[in-house]
């Protein structure tokens, strides 16, 4: 499963899921196009093997003083399925992190980059709510070593249920503030070190 079947299932189910959500994706694209300058925005994340990978999510926009429903829900991340189809991401895997965050991760967590990042977080099974980053990284490393079809299926449906309940922010963090900002807030790194990690 680790070496072939997982990639095959991503290749098989990625397009199927994209077709299923394509009507909603099209509606979201029209709405975003009307209110934002661009339909999608690019983000660079750390892919398998630590390589930089470019992915796209719907652009953020506001309605009055509030962030739009699309920007604040799992709908924003529907375009990530294209990254699964192209082989950049997996349906289930460690949460995507930015290149800046990746540059600040300790070497002990490097094993999380042995697998492709996932739309649905593999850490969903280990924690009811989003854990501290280091706890999540440790769980990601454990997943990379022990991943199986059963664990992926469980993580998929657990994450899906949480997303339907509006909990997308607990594990999906593409384009949001991340590990670097948290380290700065804790006083672990300085503003200069944050700039160097850009």
Predicted regions and their residues:
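A hydrophobic, helix-centered structural microdomain
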Residues: 1-62, 155-198
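An acidic site on a long C-lobe helix of protein kinase domains
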Residues: 4-8, 70, 74-77, 148-152
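Short, glycine-rich, amphipathic interfacial segments at transmembrane boundaries or analogous
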Residues: 38-69, 120-138
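Cytosol-/stroma-facing membrane-proximal "stalk/adaptor" domains immediately downstream
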Residues: 122-182
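A short, structured surface patch at a secondary-structure boundary
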Residues: 57-122, 156-159
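Intrinsically disordered, low-complexity boundary segments flanking structured domains
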Residues: 26-30, 42-46, 78, 106-113, ...
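Generic anion/oxyanion-binding catalytic loop in active/binding sites
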Residues: 16, 67-70, 142
């Amino acid at each position: 499963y680790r070496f072939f079947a997982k990639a095959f299932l991503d290749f098989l189910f990625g397009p199927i899921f994209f077709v299923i959500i394509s009507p909603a994706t099209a509606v979201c694209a029209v709405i975003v196009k009307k209110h934002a300058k661009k339909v999608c925005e690019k983000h660079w994340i750390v892919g398998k093997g630590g390589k930089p990978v470019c992915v796209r999510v719907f652009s953020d926009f506001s309605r009055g003083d509030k962030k739009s429903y699309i920007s604040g829900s799992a709908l924003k991340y529907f375009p990530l399925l294209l990254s699964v189809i192209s082989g950049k991401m997996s349906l289930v895997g460690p949460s995507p992190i930015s290149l800046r965050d990746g540059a600040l991760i300790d070497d002990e967590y490097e094993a999380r980059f042995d697998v492709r990042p996932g739309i649905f977080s593999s850490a969903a099974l280990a924690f009811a709510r989003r854990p501290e980053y280091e706890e999540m990284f440790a769980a990601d490393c454990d997943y990379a070593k022990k991943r199986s079809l059963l664990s992926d299926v469980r993580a998929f449906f657990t994450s899906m249920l949480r997303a339907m309940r509006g909990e997308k922010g607990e594990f999906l963090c593409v384009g949001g503030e991340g590990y670097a900002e948290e380290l700065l807030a804790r006083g672990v790194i300085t503003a200069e070190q944050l700039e160097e990690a850009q």
